[in-house]
Regions:
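Hydrophobic faces of well-ordered beta-strands that scaffold small-molecule active sites
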Residues: 88-91, 116-120, 141-145, 169
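Active-site-adjacent beta->alpha loops and helix N-cap segments on the catalytic face
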Residues: 99-104, 120-140, 148-156, 176-189, ...
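Phosphate/diphosphate-binding loops
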Residues: 157-168, 172-175
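An N-cap/entry alpha-helix motif that binds or orients negatively charged groups
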Residues: 1-81, 192-261
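Glycine-rich phosphate/pyrophosphate-binding beta-alpha loops
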Residues: 92-98
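Conserved, mostly hydrophobic/aromatic
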Residues: 32, 90, 111, 171
Length: 264
């Protein structure tokens, strides 16, 4: 009962959205400031983000006339060896439960409802098994993988993806260290959050987001945590989140021979 009431203003704003800019504004009004900035920001002076926007603004879609097209139109194609209904797919995003309680599962269901392939981040807050359970059997799924120094961690995450029907792999090789995200530094962004006076004040200004955040299970990087549990059973020693995200993350990769192939 509480959540629908708190969400009512956000849903009204969302229903009134007619373009991507409107959706961004609606998200900014609903989400905690540090969470919105985490999603919206880039590194350093955010030059790349601005250039990306400028580059996309130069693209034009030229339609054909007198081409004999009539409803229903068919946009289906094949992406990474799988049939999809639309020619694009969701980008892997870390920490989706920060933005909404449904997190990766909610995004996966939305993608499936439009016949789009879904991609799950290594740093997702839902495990591959959770995502797979929320999707129709054999729905196209991609798993994004970071190259960790601990190869057993990588193997365990790949095993999770394979066992749960993820058919393709996106290998990230251009992230050898974390970007200098200045907005995150200014906001005091941490995972899990520090409940400072400033963060509490911002949370009170966003009751719908705050209710979502407090009513869901404890925030965790699910795939990484499950992989670490597997390694712990083998090594008989614990792995802290701090270690995973600093000492063991992102080695320098000078050469990788990567041939596209199916995980299944």
């Amino acid at each position: 009962m509480v959540r629908p009431l708190l969400d009512y203003p956000s849903r009204r704003r969302l229903d009134a959205c007619i373009n991507i800019s409107d959706i961004r504004d609606a998200a900014k009004r609903r989400a905690h400031k540090m969470v919105f900035d985490y999603l919206d920001a880039g590194a350093d002076d955010e030059i790349t983000i601005r250039r990306n926007k400028d580059a996309y603004s130069q693209l034009e879609l030229h339609y054909k006339i007198l081409a004999g097209l009539s409803p229903p139109l068919d946009m289906s194609t094949r992406v990474m060896g799988r049939d999809v209904q639309i020619p694009f797919f969701t980008s892997p995003t870390a920490g989706s439960k920060m933005f909404h309680a449904d997190g990766e599962v909610g995004v996966a269901r939305a993608a499936a409802s439009h016949g789009a392939m879904y991609s799950l981040s290594t740093m997702g807050t839902a495990a591959p098994a959770e995502v797979a359970a929320a999707l129709p059997t054999h729905h196209p799924k991609l798993f994004q993988l970071y190259v960790w120094k601990d190869r057993s961690l990588v193997r365990d995450m790949l095993a999770q993806a394979r066992e749960n029907g993820f058919h393709a792999l996106a290998l990230t090789v251009d992230l050898t260290w974390y970007g200098n995200r200045e907005r995150d530094s200014r906001n005091g962004f941490t995972v899990p959050p520090n409940y400072t006076l400033r963060q509490t004040y911002e949370a009170l200004k966003r009751p719908a987001w705050t209710w979502d955040f407090l009513s869901k299970p404890e925030y965790a990087y699910a795939a990484v945590d499950l992989a670490a549990e597997g390694r712990t059973r083998r090594a008989r020693e614990g792995v802290s989140g701090e270690t995973r995200e600093s000492d063991e993350a992102f080695p320098t990769v000078s050469f990788i021979l990567f041939t596209y192939g199916q995980l299944d």
